[in-house]
Each structure stands twice: as C-alpha cells, then as structure tokens.
Amino acid sequence: MRYALMIEAQQGCSYADQLALARRAEAAGFETFLRSDHYDSFPGEAGRPTTDAWAVLAGLARETSRIRLGTLVSPVTFRHPGNLAKLTATVDEMSGGRLDVGVGAGWNQEEHDHHGFPFPPLEVRAEMLEEQLEILRGLWQGPDGWSFSGRHYQVPGGRLRPRPVQLPAPPIIVGGEGSPRSMRIAVRFADEFNLSSASPERAAERFAKLDTVARDAGRDPASLRHSAMVGALVGRDHAEVERRSRAVLDAFGMAEEGTAWFDERRPRWIYGTPDEARAMAARFEAAGCERIMLQDFLPWDLEHVDLLGEVLVRG
C-alpha cells in the first residue's frame, strides 16, 4: 500500500504550518503530501486565513527534496485551464518533477460567491472539467499551435513554456464519490481515480465498476490507479484517540456532539489504535485500493503525522 498525507489547509494553516507538515511527512516516509484547494475556511470558525494552494506548492517545491506534492483537488471553477497548465508546469519544474495534479468539479458555492467565481450547475462544471483536462493534456504534450474549441474554453494556438519535467506529463488525479460521469472522465483523462467518503465495501463495489467502465472504453483497467481519501485519526491507546477526537471536534465547533460525529464516520475512517488502524487499512487494500490519502484534520499535531508514518507507512 502507498500512502499520502492529505491536509485540509483551509483550517487556518499558514505557509509555515504547511511547510512543517510537509517536512514531517517527508521524514515519516510518506510518498506524497497533498493539500485541499479552498479559498474559504471551514468547517469551524469562519474567517481564519486561507492560502492559495498553488502558491504554497511552489514554496514547498523548493523546501522539500523527496516527497511528491499536489492538490486534492483543484476546482475547475477557480482557474482557466491555460492558467492551470502554466502553474502546474512551473511547479513541476520547481520540484524537479514531483507533482501530482488533482482536479475536480468543485462543490462549495459559498467560497465561490465570496471570491466572485461563477458557480454553474454540476452538469456544466463537469463539462468544464472535461474540457480543462483536454486542454491540460494538449498544452503539456501537444505541439506548438495545438488548438481546442469547446463549449466553455477555446485555445486557438497553444504554446506552453516551460513544459512539465515529468514525461509524458504529471500524473492526473480525478476525484469524486464514484458517479458514472466522474468515472468516465477518469477513464478518459486520468492516471488515478480517487474515491472519497467510502467504506471499504463501497470502495470495492466502485472500483469494480470503474474497471468495467475502463474495459468498455477500451482501456486496460490496470493503467488507472485506484485510490481513496480516508479520514485518519490514530492514537497509541484509547486515551490518546479520545484526546485527538476531542481536539478535532473542538476545531470544528462541534464539541457538543461528542462521539456521535465519529461514530457515523468510523465505518469509512482509519480510526483508533495502531492495531485498529492497520486492520482498516488492510480492508481498503483488499477492496482494491492501491493508495490511501490519509485525510488529517489535526494539522497542528505533528506527532500525529509521526504516528501515522510509524503505524501505516513504515508499519
């Protein structure tokens, strides 16, 4: 099993916070450090500072050495495909070819309203995502003069410099909850499909369906990596699990909910003691998951990163 550490940077994480997390994840043996791409702070206290994902990744590219870096995921609505192509090629060069590019349709209407971004219906955003991915591939890999004319975007004569360092292109991750359209988009454009909010049982069912969609489209299912974004909270004993659970609830402004919030999520989280965490990770592996993005809601707790590395990455 391969592991990435994924943080929700909109929890008020400064650049210094994210650098500390990325370096700690690198030292702990994680393959990849991923961060969300949001412009508003949530859940919990509104108004906390949020940082731009690609500005942060550019900095991390120069201040880490081994760990891969990326977004999970960048909404199609935030950036024109030409702008995203330039950003990703630049960060790939700055990192020496350590970039993963996670993209999705976006979902949080409030942050779009707060920053003046249009937020069309999901069907339109999905169309935009398909066009964005075609343009990314074309600008990264196509010849000078490559052109595209779609419903939402036009590129009359493409030319991108620098090109990405990774050949033929940085890996693309398409994320979602396993809808038919997200699977079709992943099969057409992605190197990896990332399933969110799924139990091991649902993951097995969705991955099997994804393989069928790939075969029907004439693609070898083995060429499309299966991964899952999985909430992660681990403690050395039950007392430490309880302490970290309370810290998450406090940060989310949900202390009054007690254990109910975690009880609802435990069937799809890596949660508990080291033995419980390893057992749940094994269930995801048996479901066909090749990489787990450990979604860490404790970005101020660097010892939690150490423990996740000890128990899962190196365990």
Where are each of the predicted segments found?
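Active-site-adjacent structural elements that line small-molecule/cofactor binding pockets in enzymes
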Residues: M1-G315
